[in-house]
Amino acid sequence: MKSCSARLVALVVRYSGNMSDLRDVIIVGSGPAGYTAAIYLGRAGFNPLVIAGALTPGGQLVNTTEVENFPGFPDGVMGPELMDNMQRQAEKFGAEIVWDDVVSVSNNDVTGVKTVSVDQGDVFETHALIIATGSEYRKLDIPGEAEYSGKGVSYCATCDGFFF
């Protein structure tokens, strides 16, 4: 078993500079959908690469206090804790995580290879690409919307409906 420092050096060497190697599967997004895909792919013998994002990995759940409607947590779970657990489970099954933002995706129509470039300059290639970038709230930009957000203005009926 490699020591932590040996693994860190291997990761730094592997992810430094402009490189391109064919990956089994690349998953763009580190929310529940991205990590679930990574877990199932890892268990199936693939080596998924998750491009998690540089600033807000973990999706919208990292900004959620208590998640009460996720199976297996009858007393609820904090959003960041749930996402940390999902990340660890994905890594347990062989997922590699890159903390960077995707800047471009292209497809070679002849070979079917998808090329994913990230902000730090690295380039990754794959035949299978999963886009799991989630969603964002659609705001109306009307007077009082920001002021009353969470105080009567809600963006998630299944999340907040019982409050009203």
Predicted stretch roles:
Residues 19-28, 44, 49, 56, ...:
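FAD-binding core/adjacent interface of flavoenzyme oxidoreductases
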Residues 7, 14-15:
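Short, positively charged and aromatic/hydrophobic N-terminal segments
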Residues 10-12, 30, 35, 143, ...:
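Alpha-helical structural elements
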Residues 23-93:
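Beta1-alpha1 glycine-rich phosphate/pyrophosphate-binding loop at the start
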